Amino acid sequence: ATGLRGGIVVDEHYQTNQPDIYAVGDAVVVKQQITQEDALISLASPANRQGRQVADVIAGLERKNQGSIGTAIVRVFDLTAASTGLSERAAKAAGLTTAVVHISGKDHAGYYPGATDLQLKLVFHPTTGEIYGAQGIGAKGVDKRIDILATAIKGQLTIFDLPELEFTYAPPFGSAKDPVNMLGYAAMNLAEGLSENVQWYELSNELANGAVLLDVRNPAEQANGQFKNAVSIPLNELRERLEELDKSTKYIVSCHSGLRSYIAERMLKQAGISAKNLDGAFALYRMVKPEELENV
């Protein structure tokens, strides 16, 4: 029998509806492990695993098809892009309550020669912390982080476990706080109510509804590009210049990567000023909406 998009329907032991006929690989319908919905996941790793499992089943051993989360990677010129689990769009389409964080980091300690940028995105449940998926892009180190997050999903770890994960560390290989740890910290800040974020695709609507963008980068950073119509107050001057901000206005705060804007968000909230953090900050916005920036 066939099912989704003509894929072969099999049971949990890879048996078709015909006696003694089994099917595995790209042609079979599997369960998307997170949503438990039917899926066609055409990847070599699950297909090879299925071959081993069906051989065990035919030999009389108990092996079950547990489905797949769909972990994939591709090289595009000098960049690597990888994903695991559900995208933000897929999670929302499945009806899951969804939150998202982006972080910018380096593949290893930034002060050690040869460090390159990478961007990571985490999709998760905002209260339980269940991890739905992750994506990453960068020159180096993306495979390592997505493999870790794929393992976390398979092992049913949550965002609250990510800061506690331990990795081998020396400056040529990583950072004392790995980008995966930082993803966990950022996600926990949302889950615990310490931060509220605005996604890049929500910014224009927020500004149209009266919010003001506050850029806390320093002048040297702003020489590499600026948000249009943003209020500029460097973070190290913000506490002394809080009186310049209107307590009746909602502020969306950005820096280069999101860390300083989180600090600024906390400062504003403690001063009784409404504030949210632009998730991914300038670094992400420059990647997805460069036409809306000045002097890029």
What spans do the regions from the language model cover?
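FAD-site-proximal beta/loop scaffold in flavoenzymes
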Residues: 1-53, 152
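A short alpha-helix-loop-beta-strand transition element characteristic
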Residues: 2-5, 61-71, 97-101
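Active-site flanking residues adjacent to catalytic metal/cofactor-binding acidic residues
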Residues: 25, 214-216
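Short glycine-enriched, charge-decorated loop/helix-capping segments at active-site entrances
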Residues: 37-42, 137-138, 228-229
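Active-site-proximal substrate-binding core of FAD-dependent oxidoreductases
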Residues: 38-42, 57-84, 164-170
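Short, hydrophobic alpha-helical segments
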Residues: 55-62, 153, 191
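Flexible, glycine-rich terminal cap/loop adjacent to redox cofactors
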Residues: 78-84, 92-194
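Rhodanese-like catalytic fold shared by cysteine-dependent sulfurtransferases
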Residues: 160-171, 175-212, 219-252, 256-296
